[in-house]
Amino acid sequence: MRIGLLTDGGYPYATGESRLWCDRLVRGLPQHEFDLFALSRSAHQEDQGWVRLPHHVSRVRTAPLWTPEDGTPRGGGERGLLARLVTGGGVSYGRRDRKRFAAHVEALATAVCATEDTGTAPADGGGLFTEGFYGLAELARERGGLHLALRSETTVRILEAASRARGAGRTVQSATVVDHLAFAAELERVLRPLSLDWYGPESLGAVDLCHAASGGAAAIPGLLAKRFFGVPLLVTEHGVQLRTHYLAAPDASFGAPVRALLARFYTLLAAEVYRQASLVTAGNTHVRRWQQRCGADPAQLRTVYPGMAAERFSAVGEDDDAGGPDTLVWVGRIEPAKDLIALLHAFAEVRRAEPDARLRIFGAPVVGDEATTYLAHCRALAAQLFPDEATGAHTEGVSPVTFEEIGGPEVPGLAEAYAAGGVIVLSSVVEGFPISLVESMFCGRATVSTDVGAVVEVIGGTGLVAPPRNPRALADACIALLRDPERRARLGAAARARALELFTVEQNLAAFRGIYLELISHAPVRREADALDADGEPRLFAAPAEARLLGPWTQPQPAAVGAPVPGWAAAGAEPEAARRAGSVPEPGCLCATACGPGDGDA
């Protein structure tokens, strides 16, 4: 079949989000033909070029989501901004089109400015939102010029009137003209996919299935492909756009009214994406809970874990060497969300109980002023808490805490970093899908983690969990494993078995291979051109008779109630191992999931 893969700020560009996952998906399903529709985030990303594409990628269409303020578009011809956006250039609307535009923006603004519902379902503004959203899409398709109109004085006046209207939220009512100008600019940027020239019978109209690699802007072309051509939409989210907006809000340059308007817009857009999608897959149940809160139907949700390459860690995982028995290892990007400050204070407690313990911190190369400042702060705290210690009068003092960069001569790769210790520690206060934990599980290492994001779901009962921002609890868990090598080995073996059964690339590809076939069989695209021969005459048996009848084969099937349980946790396994295997799988998961800490070590 022909798959339209929709991305935002990632594949096929050499840098960006979900790049590796998309590349593995495309390369792992060579029986399908892929058309790529990619939105870029910056001029720098476009300058980095594309990754090498496999032969079954037949077409690539790109468009920028960045504005001239972020960087001047380079090049003319097909790579220029105006050539890839059917925006009409300097086209101005006539009186009838101006009236249509004002009506659609008014409906959209009324929905966005309305008080957000505090329950789990979307507010009543969803109807107005879809009316304005699809109205603008049809206007852009017919007339172009939408990007100029959304930045016009008309848009600002409509937003100002909607924020003053009855039913608007208190925060929105305090918005100033500057806030409305800022929101109009952000709205134009997010709605830029409405003006693309992708919505023709030879473009998105020619694919059998649209697969959006994320929600938000990447899913907008899929919404329009379904509306204009009836193409089914599959949405995969490893993180929720609304959650990302909330996490980034404290560092944003916008005021509270603009942040509130953007949050409301993303909420309504997410609800519409989930409503129109034939199926929505979540990278973990933490994301799945966010999707349900944003209005997704639980019957349309499935959990498909992101596949990871286990081969690079096989040598460490199969080796009998358990690493440094007194060494704790932390691996990841050094940034405030990882809370290395709490880890250092926890290690101070560990050293009081275990004087021979060591802590090795392996970080990726630091990028940015914030990360550089944070690393310097962590080094200063480590020097204060753990001054260099000498074993004798004529030996050089050595600190029990070391900061090492992955890629150096001593630690050329991640596998060597995980092999350096017997216990892997994760101290984050914010975490989505904990990739470093899965990698350590592939290496057969016992773990101590904070209970954030999808941590408990990933480790099941194969590691210890402590509350975030609690150095004493984190230290107690580390001490327990350092003093019990048998338990450490048992948990490491169970962790490796769990990771190999749930988090490999093969599991991920098998899940999407089945999903593609399921969606096409339940909702095939019927095109008039396919029903006619070369002479324009009706083609016999172009569609089976069953396609015209209502029956169970024409309705989407609910997700399976049961999910496969890992073999090491199935019936007949060793009682102790089964007790530590985690909790009962959640309905609708394609891979077994742990919905709670269970009654094992966690």
Model-derived regions: residue spans:
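Short acidic alpha-helix that forms the nucleotide-activated donor recognition element
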Residues: 271-275, 394-421, 442, 472-476
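Conserved donor-binding/catalytic core segment of Leloir-type glycosyltransferases
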Residues: 312-351, 359-365
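Nucleotide-activated donor-binding/catalytic signature segment of Leloir-type glycosyltransferases, i.e.
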Residues: 372-409
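Aromatic "clamp/platform" in nucleotide-sugar-dependent glycosyltransferases that forms part
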Residues: 429
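Short hydrophobic beta-strand element within catalytic cores of glycosyltransferases
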Residues: 444-449
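Short acidic/histidine- and often glycine-rich active-site loop of Leloir-type glycosyltransferases
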Residues: 452-465
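Conserved acidic donor-binding segment of nucleotide-sugar-dependent glycosyltransferases
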Residues: 464-471, 480-486
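A short, well-ordered alpha-helix in the C-terminal region of glycosyltransferases
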Residues: 473, 487-502, 508-518, 528-532
